[in-house]
Amino acid sequence: VPNLYLQLEMLPIDITESDNQKFDSKDREVQKKFAPYFKHRGIDLGTQHAFYRDFCLATRHCEDGHRDICLAFPMALPQNTDRIVGFEECGRARLDGQDSYKGMAEGSNTDEGLWIASPARTPLAEAKHIYWFGSAYDAMAFYQLHRAQNQELRKAVFISTGGDLTEKQMRGVLEQTIP
């Protein structure tokens, strides 16, 4: 992908100013748009299908006409998983040609927000198994590596902190899972 950006630094996408395209498990053309973001991590199509409700492509339209696109994992509060409070961003190429940008979208609630996903749509409060990760990519890779040996993994809840775990993130999950 040619580098068309003139700015010196990649800025995170503001969650209030981005267009989001969901992965469509039935539309091969839409799936192809996501492939570059998963290929370098070895995340196969089966794993993408398992988590298809829990990631999107976020696009920020810049004033100079170019677009910043990245793979985004929506973050929610444990007590209200239907309300997106931020995005864990991955996969945007950096201007210097090095590794891709990873971080949190501008405006994200990084203190309390978490990526909370379950292939079987198991609610957090009903989960028998919860797996914690520092990134959603790592959670998906873990699922992919172990799904054949552990059929129950589909019912588990996978959580990404998007970086370092905070006390509020931990408390939020514990409040929903400990009777």
Question: Which residue stretches match the model-derived regions?
Answer:
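Basic, glycine-enriched DNA-binding surface that flanks or lies within the catalytic cores of DNA
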Residues: P2-N109
